[in-house]
Amino acid sequence: MATEYWSRHLRSVLAPLFAAAGTYSPEDQESHLAFIDEHIAPNLGPLPWEPHGPYSTPSSLVGSPFDPSINIVSSGKAKVRFDFDVISPPDRTGPDPFAEGSAREILHRLADLVGADTQWMGYLMDALYLTPAEAEVAKTKLPPGVAIPPSSVGFDFDGPERTLKFYIPSVRKALATGQDVSELMLKTLRGLQPLGSELVPAMDLIASYLSTRTNDAMLPLVGIDCLDPRTHKNARVKCYLHTSSNSFAVVRDVLTLGGRLSDDTSLKRVETLKSVWPLLINELEGPQSDAATMDESWSKPERLNRTGYSGIQYTIEITPGQAIPDTKIYVPLFQYTDSSEVAERNFESALKKLGNEWGLSGKYRSVMQEIFKDVENYGQTYASFSYTEGKGVYTTSYVAMPIKDEGGGSLAGDFGFRN
């Protein structure tokens, strides 16, 4: 029954996204949806009104454990993606209180299905999952309201291909062992194999920045592409940074690693983002509405403070042999308006300003209105932004179908990394 429920929930968003993207043949769409029915729906846990560990994805804002998204490059080409958290037990009891054993089983099974490489994933699991003794310590130190998934699972869909992505936090291990969250993650990443030595120059930049930054940026999470880096030189290690402040001065500082990234691409990335910043934070009137003259030191008050999704998230994306990393920002649109319609309109205006076909033609809002036509206020959760010389500007829209059975849903309250 739960699998059938989750299959309907997943299809309600993903089927129209695949159709709208314009990059998937009918055969691709049918294959991907069948894969989702058979291998993703069974892993979303019990029915939402039955006992389960807290949902901690941004989609928990509307009661869902599942984060669908659509990535749109400057040419208008689009790719569908999604991620979900491995669901923990409701009461942290039993032999697998934090679902780390379950996460190992789920991820290795999915890796086998799609032919993914597990070398980096296996190393990170061994380094950051808890020993039995550490699990006992974590149970006493972690307050019940803290939601830290053991891992998150993601998939990118490129034509007929499916690429597995794996995400793992260092927060629980740091708490259980008394280590600093960022230092533990950096130490762990320095031992990554294979090709860990080729990641060191970019890792050194991140470590240097975190040791001298004037804001509170920290590194609680890492994500990887489950590809063999020896044959896929574009395999990424994505270092997720978080800041409490949402001022553009802090954004600029993080995206350039305190000025360490001063190449033309990094600087253009920041200035292009600045041109649409007022739209992303819903500042359409007043002094902060003009990107050219706005006060970069100003932080906008948030709707929902003290949540796991307050402030701003970033990724510093490193690949073997590349000394200069790419940087990306994730803006929580829901923090700046309680209306999905307003967030949707602002995001399309940003696409239009960036010259993206999905904005210029009105396609973005048309697709959203078709998917969520029966929903009064859906989850417009995040927008990500980056720029590279090869891709140009590329953005991702993260959306979520509400689960009404959850009574409206509530955003995950605390991930523990600021405690």
Curated annotation (Swiss-Prot):
Coiled coil: none annotated. The gene is tdiB. Pathway: Secondary metabolite biosynthesis. Substrate binds at R81, K165, Y167, R236, K238, Y240, Y330, Y394. This is Indole prenyltransferase tdiB. Induction: Specifically expressed at both asexual stages. Expression is positively regulated by the secondary metabolism regulator laeA. Expression is also positively regulated by mpkB. Expression is also positively regulated by mtfA. The keyword Transferase applies. Disulfide bonds: none annotated. It comes from the Eukaryota. GO terms for biological process: secondary metabolite biosynthetic process; sterigmatocystin biosynthetic process; terrequinone A biosynthetic process. The keyword Transferase applies. L-tryptophan binds at P58, S59.
